[in-house]
């Protein structure tokens, strides 16, 4: 029996959460080995497991993969979530890069100095309302299909829906004016594998709180 993928990261969302989402949606079970201290990260670096001295790192199918996008692309290819031809893959990449741009803003928000946080939140909300959500809504409207690309599930749908959940934690009303995004969120959330991942007790991680933020800062030696 093949080994399950083993995910090396800290016990929080960060840059691993999208990988958790994609594996879960694909129905591929995985194990996790959490770093608890800076020494745990140093050990991975010193034993040569991290090509660029960085995590996330996933042991999968005999490889030690790093770089979030490379890992996501491998999982998507493995589970037929990456389109049927070059044109579809180009669209999927274009949409997921847009998702990644907004995701990065949300991901780094906890590290924002307190005196700058309100302004940063307002900036993110403005980008959501005027740039990113209208763009994805327009794609869905343009073809009238259930999924972003090729009328079949792809990594673009899964990663966009993960982002929708994250944005709703920041602004519960953000999706209200985008009916097709709301419908996509409901559709993807109803898939048995995703529905299971959204249940309490799954490997999905909660929003970053102060305790986990301080722990992450110590592990990654962030001032």
Swiss-Prot record:
Subunit structure: Homodimer or heterodimer of GSTA1 and GSTA2.
Listed name of the protein: Glutathione S-transferase alpha I
Tissue: Liver and lung.
Modified residues (N-acetylalanine): 2
Any one GO BP annotation for this protein: xenobiotic metabolic process
GO molecular function, one term: glutathione transferase activity
Keywords assigned by UniProt, alphabetized: Acetylation, Cytoplasm, Transferase
Broad class of the protein's primary localization: cytoplasm
Domain of life: Eukaryota
UniProt-annotated binding residues for glutathione: 9, 45, 54-55, 67-68
Residues found modified as N-acetylmethionine: 1
Subcellular location: Cytoplasm
Gene Ontology terms: cellular component: cytosol; extracellular exosome
Modified residues (N6-succinyllysine): 4
UniProt EC number: 2.5.1.18
Domain GST N-terminal: 3-83
Domain GST C-terminal: 85-208
Described function: Glutathione S-transferase that catalyzes the nucleophilic attack of the sulfur atom of glutathione on the electrophilic groups of a wide range of exogenous and endogenous compounds. Involved in the formation of glutathione conjugates of both prostaglandin A2 (PGA2) and prostaglandin J2 (PGJ2). It also catalyzes the isomerization of D5-androstene-3,17-dione (AD) into D4-androstene-3,17-dione and may therefore play an important role in hormone biosynthesis.
Family recorded in the similarity comment: Belongs to the GST superfamily. Alpha family.
Reactions catalysed: RX + glutathione = an S-substituted glutathione + a halide anion + H(+); prostaglandin A2 + glutathione = prostaglandin A2-S-(R)-glutathione; prostaglandin J2 + glutathione = prostaglandin J2-S-(R)-glutathione; (13S)-hydroperoxy-(9Z,11E)-octadecadienoate + 2 glutathione = (13S)-hydroxy-(9Z,11E)-octadecadienoate + glutathione disulfide + H2O
Species in which this protein is naturally found: Oryctolagus cuniculus
InterPro entries reported for this sequence: Glutathione-S-Trfase_C-like (IPR010987), Glutathione-S-Trfase_C_sf (IPR036282), Glutathione_S-Trfase_N (IPR004045), GST_alpha (IPR003080), GST_C (IPR004046), GST_superfamily (IPR050213), Thioredoxin-like_sf (IPR036249)
């Amino acid at each position: 029996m093949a080994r399950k993928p083993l995910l090396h990261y800290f016990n929080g969302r960060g840059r691993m959460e999208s990988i958790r989402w994609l594996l879960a949606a694909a129905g591929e079970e995985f194990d996790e080995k959490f770093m608890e201290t800076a020494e745990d990260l140093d050990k991975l670096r010193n034993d040569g497991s991290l090509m660029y001295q960085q995590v996330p790192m996933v042991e999968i199918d005999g490889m030690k993969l790093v770089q979030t996008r490379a890992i996501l692309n491998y999982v998507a290819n493995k589970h037929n979530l990456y389109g049927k031809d070059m044109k579809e893959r180009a669209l999927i990449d274009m949409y997921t890069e847009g998702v990644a741009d907004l995701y990065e803003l949300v991901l780094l928000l906890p590290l924002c100095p307190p005196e700058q946080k309100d302004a940063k939140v307002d900036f993110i909300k403005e980008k959501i309302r005027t740039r990113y959500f209208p763009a994805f809504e327009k794609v869905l409207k343009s073809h009238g299909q259930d999924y972003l690309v090729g009328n079949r599930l792809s990594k673009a749908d899964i990663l966009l829906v993960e982002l929708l959940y994250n944005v709703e934690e920041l602004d519960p009303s953000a999706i209200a004016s985008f009916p097709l995004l709301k419908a996509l969120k409901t559709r993807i959330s109803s898939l048995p594998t995703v529905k299971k991942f959204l249940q309490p007790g799954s490997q999905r991680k909660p929003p970053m709180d102060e305790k986990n933020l301080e722990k992450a800062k110590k592990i990654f030696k962030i001032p």
